[in-house]
Amino acid sequence: MQRIPFPEVGIAYWFNRMAKESLMVAYGATEADAGSDLVSLRTRAEHVIENGQIKGYKITGSKMWISSGAVADLYTVLALAPGGPSWFLVEKGTPGFTQDKHEDKHGIRLSNTAGLSFDEVYVPAANLIGGVEGKGLLQAQAVFGYTRLMVAAFGLGAGEEAIETAIDYANHRIQAGGPLSEKQGYMLKLITPHYIKFEAARAFIDETAKKLDVNNHGQATEGSIGKYYATEAGNKAAEDAIQALGGFGYTKEFAVEKIKRDVKITCIYEGTNEVMEMTIYRGRWQEHLKSRGAYYNNIADEMDAIHAKNPEVGANVIALGLRALATVLEECRLQRLTRHQYITFKLGELIANAEVAAAFCRAIGNGKIVEGCKFDAETLKAMCRVNAKETAYDIASRGAKLVLSAGTADAAALLNATHFVQIEANMHGCIEDSDKVSAKLREIFRK
């Protein structure tokens, strides 16, 4: 609420009440036909006129999937007022306002989730957040940078806990004369790649959080990138942690089964990850167009400068990947391939991977270690190299595949333009670096 332009009297009144009465607040936006797409809003707020002035509003409609919906004391509710989508404060117990039953969910089962119903619920005009109608969607978007980055941290933490449980198990589980954690195939398939992604995600989340601290707003695309990358990584890590524990992982005796159920919601709420892909694509597509293709080439130049200063983090390779991304985006523009929604989704994914890898190189290349990191500088460099190489290879190969699958480009020319052979030539050392990371994981988590 402090990010939204309340009248000063509103801030003092509501914040004092929240503090003194320990009020729990719920966020009421989602509807049956308006999930990640809030434009489809159906809940209405009609004027109540007295002596020619707007005295208040009567809200009618319903909400669903509201966190703390049945237990909150105060609700921020998005409704369509005559002037456009607007947020209103509604107190529990207001006549006509009812809370539905707690949903029986797949995961986060202790978190209350319920629907809300409004039958001509009257609220005074002072309860219009911001004091002006029609600002609701802008107000919601203003906090997406924060809220989606918060969910990114959820996904990262859940994935880490799952993999750390698996490492602990692998350090003690003896197979074929030694612990599972010493088996290269086990580690490089089920454990090590996840921790490399975690550290990349941590670097990006930290970088974006610092920007938010300075700018106090915006970063909607960056928040979407963080949420998409970290929650996809956390969800896949939890799934592989179950596999890493074998039959034990499938039982409720071990935490990984619960983590897998809980982490899945991070790929859904605060905007599904498909909406994140679309949001990322839209934001960076505009940057590509405005810069006439220079946006990712400029970041590539930055990576080359980092490589000149610190050649041990793979920044030169992700620079090739970023230039490949610029080429793929330009081919999509020239051939009008973004008319295919699937391609826009996949572009969003490639963009997210590229920007996270660049942030990782930026942090480690400049000697910045995120607070709370478990790894020394040399291990982080090895992680960064692996991530940069694999991300660049993925961008060049999958980006070319996207263009070729829907367009008419010459395959050989496209592979040359995306620097595919150069990227391939830089893949040397990935297994060796991954083994170094595995050794450090065994050391850190051996109890």
Task: Go through the PLM ranges and name each one.
Residues 10, 140, 158, 162, ...:
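Extended, hydrophobic alpha-helical segments in both membrane/secreted and soluble proteins
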Residues 55-99:
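A short core secondary-structure module
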Residues 170-171, 175-179, 198-229, 242-245, ...:
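C-terminal helix-coil-helix/basic helical segment that borders enzyme active sites and/or dimer interfaces
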Residues 2-31, 49-57:
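FAD-binding glycine-rich core of flavoenzymes that anchor FAD
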Residues 99-199, 264-269, 273-355:
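Glycine-rich beta->alpha junctions and the first turn(s) of the following alpha-helix
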Residues 139, 248-315, 403-447:
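Glycine-rich phosphate/cofactor-binding loops in nucleotide/flavin-utilizing enzymes
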